[in-house]
Amino acid sequence: MDKSVRVFKLRTQTEEQLVGELGKLQTELSQLRIAKIAGGTANKLGRIGIVRKAIAKYLTIINEKRRQAVKDQFKGKSLKPLDIRVKKTRAIRRKLTKKQREAVLVKTQKKLNNFGLRKFALKA
C-alpha cells in the first residue's frame, strides 16, 4: 500500500476494486494491531493511523458511489427517500407552496368580482 491514498484516484476505480482493496487494508490493520500487542516496532505502530485513515477514505468513496446510484435511480420521481432529498431548513420545509399562497376563498373571490376596489379623489 502507498503511504497515503489519493482520493481522486479512488474515484476512477469500480466498486468491486474498492471493496477488494478495503478488505486488504482491514486485514493489514488487524495484523498491525496484533503486532502492537506483541510489541512491534515503532514504524508499525505509526502505520496504524495511516491505515485507519485509508480505510475511512475507501469507505467514503464506496458510500458516495452507492448514494449516487440511488440518486440516479430516483431522478425525476416525485417521492424520494429522506436521505436523498435536498437538505433544507425546517422552516423552509414547512413554508407554504406557491399554489397554497395564491389560493383565495370562494367568498373572497365573489367579493372582489362584485365589489371592485374603490377609488378616492382628494379635494384640493
Curated annotation (Swiss-Prot):
Q: Which HAMAP family has this protein been placed in? A: Ribosomal_uL29
One GO cellular component from the entry? Answer: cytosolic large ribosomal subunit
What keywords does the record list, in alphabetical order? Ribonucleoprotein, Ribosomal protein
InterPro entries, per this entry?
Ribosomal_uL29 (IPR001854), Ribosomal_uL29_euk (IPR045059), Ribosomal_uL29_sf (IPR036049)
Q: What's one GO BP annotation on this UniProt entry?
A: maturation of LSU-rRNA from tricistronic rRNA transcript (SSU-rRNA, 5.8S rRNA, LSU-rRNA)
Identify the PANTHER family for this entry: 60S RIBOSOMAL PROTEIN L35, LARGE RIBOSOMAL SUBUNIT PROTEIN UL29-RELATED
Sequence similarity? Belongs to the universal ribosomal protein uL29 family.
* GO terms, molecular function: mRNA binding; structural constituent of ribosome
The name this protein goes by in its record = Large ribosomal subunit protein uL29
What gene, per UniProt, encodes this protein?
RPL35
Q: Name one Pfam family in it.
A: Ribosomal_L29
